[in-house]
A protein has these predicted regions:
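Conserved MFS/SLC helix-loop-helix module at the cytosolic interface between two early adjacent transmembrane helices
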Residues: 83-119, 298-299
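C-terminal transmembrane helical hairpin of 12-TM major facilitator-type secondary transporters
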Residues: 302-348
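A late C-terminal transmembrane helix in Major Facilitator Superfamily
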Residues: 353-390
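Helix-breaking motifs and short loop linkers at transmembrane-helix boundaries and internal kinks
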Residues: 64, 96, 117-123, 151, ...
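Extracytoplasmic gate region of multi-pass secondary transporters
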Residues: 52-53, 237-287
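Juxtamembrane intracellular "pre-TM" segments in multi-pass secondary transporters
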Residues: 18-27, 212-241, 426
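Helix-loop-helix hairpin linking two adjacent transmembrane segments in secondary transporters
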Residues: 161-209
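Cytoplasmic helix-loop-helix junction between adjacent transmembrane helices
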Residues: 127-166
Length: 426
């Protein structure tokens, strides 16, 4: 049954329903357990995504992929995520979110379990796309779920997902390479992570209450909230400008994440373990999305994002033009990770949802997923081709240092007056 009508009603303030919602507000333990399980599912999602990158040299050697093919497989799964974005947005606005979440986790877990069975480029690409589609649907549904429940702290709520993603990004390469070494096969981690995804489905089905996942923004006792200053259409000047910035973010982050381990191992001659640590350090930077989200609830998000992208440009220049020492690589991999995955991902996502009315947040989240991951889908291939033509240093300059400046230009079109604030900004 469509849930559009209740959400439309919330747009006007929801005064009548607000007091009832307060009296039936779930116990703190129920909320903590429910959102803890949802966060754990996103940790598994991130681990599932990140394990491919440090194992790419072994996968290429085993299956005979070129660098360009490997780069496309490393980030090409995000094409499935991009394809999921818009339909996921409509589903989230119309179908119970808990059902969408469970189905999406099942899809990406099956895709992960099928990956070790690949015998060539075509079937592995198909399995990666299936995983990506499920992960894209989950990303849209999960961001709307937490942002709607914690509406006045939307950026911090989405930042908590970024922290979960960062934890998974940190653990994925380390756990994945450890499992691969222990079992003597790059296939073993995919089996382990796929089974973990199936297990979390059961835990969410039992431990997450429906009133946590189906909350409507602005309907839980917040009658004072007004939305008439927001655009009537979900695809408006702000969301389109933010989509351009988001696409730049996807090209930068996934291009970097997909081939940075290969750069460390082939150009700087790092061991597999050292490259895995460097990749995990990026995840530590992502975990700072809690701080970036907290800031996003309190300051002008356009200004915050501008500073973020300038930081990404500076850190990428230092990363690929500085010394090959481990401490240098680790420090600036962390800075780039916290700028792009910590701040840009969190604040572009929340700013998009704040630029639409409550019954349209699913479509805003879907647009974010589509724009971010459609760019991410080609990022590894583009970066690999630039490396083949220009070498690592100049390829990094154009893709990792110039593109954040494109995002800065797009942000000039964002109207801060048509973004819903938390009430803490002026």
């Amino acid at each position: 049954m469509s849930r559009s009508s209740p959400r439309t009603g919330a747009e006007s303030g929801g005064a009548a329903d607000g007091s009832a919602a307060v009296s039936h507000r779930p116990a703190p333990l129920v909320v903590a357990v429910g959102f803890g399980l949802l966060g754990l599912s996103y940790v598994i999602n991130a681990m599932d995504r990140q394990v491919f990158y440090p194992l790419l040299p072994e996968i290429r050697a085993d299956l005979g992929f070129s660098l360009a093919q490997g780069g496309l497989l490393a980030t090409g799964f995000t094409l499935g995520m991009a394809a999921a974005g818009v339909p996921a947005g409509y589903l989230v606005d119309r179908v119970p979110r808990k059902i969408v979440l469970l189905a999406s986790i099942f899809l990406y877990s099956i895709g992960t379990l099928l990956t070790p069975l690949a015998s060539g480029f075509a079937d592995m690409a198909a399995y990666r796309l299936l995983s990506g589609f499920g992960e894209g649907v989950q990303s849209a549904a999960l961001s709307v779920t937490v942002a709607s429940y914690f509406y006045l702290h939307r950026s911090f709520a989405i930042g908590s997902l970024g922290a979960a993603f960062g934890l998974g990004t940190f653990l994925g390469p380390i756990v994945g390479t450890t499992v691969a070494v222990d079992f003597g096969s790059w296939r073993a981690p995919f089996v382990a992570f796929g089974c973990a995804g199936l297990a979390i489905i059961v835990l969410i089905a039992v431990g997450v209450r429906r009133h946590l996942t189906e909350s409507v923004a602005g309907s839980r006792g917040n009658a004072e909230l007004r939305f008439d200053h927001l655009p009537e259409r979900p695809y408006n000047r702000n969301t389109i400008a933010l989509a351009v910035a988001t696409a730049s973010t996807g090209l930068v982050f996934y291009g970097f994440l997909g081939l940075y381990p290969t750069y460390l191992r082939t150009e700087l001659h790092y061991s597999a373990g050292q490259a895995a640590v460097a990749t995990s350090i990026v995840g530590v930077g992502s975990a700072f999305s809690l701080l970036w989200g907290w800031l996003g609830d309190r300051v002008n998000q356009r200004t915050l994002l501008t500073v973020t992208y300038l930081g990404a440009t500076a850190s990428s220049l230092l990363l690929f033009n500085g010394p090959p020492t481990r401490w240098w690589q680790y420090v600036f991999a962390f800075v780039l990770g916290t700028c792009i995955s910590g701040s840009a991902f969190t604040n572009c996502n929340s700013a998009m949802q704040r630029s639409v009315r409550p019954h349209q947040v699913g479509r805003a989240a879907g647009l974010f997923v589509a724009s971010y991951y459609s760019a991410a889908a080609i990022s590894g291939f583009v970066f690999a081709e630039l490396v083949n033509v220009l070498g690592w240093r100049y390829a990094a300059f154009w893709q990792l240092s110039v593109l954040p400046l494109v995002a800065v230009a797009a942000l000039r079109l964002v109207d801060p007056g048509k973004i819903m604030t938390s009430g803490r900004r002026r």
